[in-house]
Amino acid sequence: MPPKPTYVSGGSVTQTGRSKWRLSYIPEFIWGILNQITFFFSTLIGGTVEPRRRPNNQGGGRRLAGFDGNGNVTGGSGVGGSGPSKGPDNGSNNRRGDMKNILACNSASGSUGPK
């Protein structure tokens, strides 16, 4: 058991320390509850806000090349994002997150999945 902290009262040093049931315990407990409630709601409200995205079926603007929903590389020419795919046309079936296939595709062997 750890030693009790020293407590100075009226100029004399004692080893008893403060009681667990002191009067200041009540407001400390109430402030602790209020802080927990505040932190809870601040995490719900204070998250990072991402900008709203326009649905894909609405035209306007030029779509940049990237990945479609299946992880394939897509082109981005034309209004509304339609255009030919600019990805490799060698039978690649890599998906985003499949690190084994990505590393095999980038290896010096030149093989990029089944052909």
From Swiss-Prot:
| Polar residues: compositionally biased ranges | 104-115
Report TM segments: 29-49
For this protein, the record's InterPro entries field holds: Se_SelK/SelG (IPR024491)
A single GO cellular-component term on record: Golgi apparatus
Q: Where is the composition biased (Gly residues)?
A: 58-84
Predominant location: membrane
For whether the record's keyword set contains rRNA-binding, the answer is: no
List, alphabetically, the Pfam families matched. SelK_SelG
* Location of the region described as Disordered in the Swiss-Prot/TrEMBL record: 48-115
Provide the topology term for how it sits in the membrane: Single-pass membrane protein
UniProt keyword list: Membrane, Selenocysteine, Transmembrane, Transmembrane helix
> Which GO BP terms apply?
calcium ion transport; endoplasmic reticulum calcium ion homeostasis
| Membrane listed as a keyword | yes
Q: Where in the cell is it found?
A: Membrane
State the superkingdom: Eukaryota
Per the similarity annotation, which family is this? Belongs to the selenoprotein K family.
- UniProt cross-references to PANTHER family, sorted A to Z: SELENOPROTEIN K
This protein is called what?
A: Selenoprotein K homolog
